[in-house]
Amino acid sequence: MGVTFEFVYILVLLAISTGLSVILFFLGYFLMFKVAYEDKLMGYECGFDPFGNARGEFDIRFYLVAILFLIFDLEITFLFPFSVSIMSMTLLSYSLMLIFLIILTIGFIYEIKKGALDWS
């Protein structure tokens, strides 16, 4: 039995799941009720009638906080393999982890000094 024969099962499963998905999608689309009235076409805003435009502008500080969150979230992602293999780490691994943490800490202190996190 070759490698190509083993992939036949995967292709059959993929074809069946794709066909079933397409059939169910079109079945739901053609059987749904298509009654459009004014209340159904309005946007839902916490049970109240919508007032104002939903596409308002955001303050730039929200974006800065989001970027900082992404940076430190990635830091945790990069530090996870170190924490899992801490018993078998060498001196080089420890030094690389320490340099990585120092660079991120310096960046965080720089953000605080520049006032990127001040909301006043």
Curated annotation (Swiss-Prot):
It comes from the Eukaryota. Its EC number is 7.1.1.2. It is an enzyme of class 7 (translocase). It is a multi-pass membrane protein. InterPro entries: NAD(P)H_OxRDtase_bac/plastid, NADH_UbQ/plastoQ_OxRdtase_su3, NDAH_ubi_oxred_su3_sf. The chain crosses the membrane at residues 7-27, 62-82, 89-109. It is found in: Mitochondrion membrane. Its main location: mitochondrion. GO terms for cellular component: mitochondrial membrane; respiratory chain complex I. It holds the Pfam family Oxidored_q4. Keywords: Electron transport, Membrane, Mitochondrion, NAD, Respiratory chain, Translocase, Transmembrane, Transmembrane helix, Transport, Ubiquinone. Gene3D superfamilies: NADH:ubiquinone/plastoquinone oxidoreductase, chain 3 (1.20.58.1610). The keyword Electron transport applies. GO terms for molecular function: NADH dehydrogenase (ubiquinone) activity. The keyword Repeat does not apply. It catalyses: a ubiquinone + NADH + 5 H(+)(in) = a ubiquinol + NAD(+) + 4 H(+)(out). Belongs to the complex I subunit 3 family. Core subunit of the mitochondrial membrane respiratory chain NADH dehydrogenase (Complex I) that is believed to belong to the minimal assembly required for catalysis. Complex I functions in the transfer of electrons from NADH to the respiratory chain. The immediate electron acceptor for the enzyme is believed to be ubiquinone. PANTHER family: NADH-UBIQUINONE OXIDOREDUCTASE CHAIN 3. HAMAP family: NDH1_NuoA. This is NADH-ubiquinone oxidoreductase chain 3. The gene is nad3.
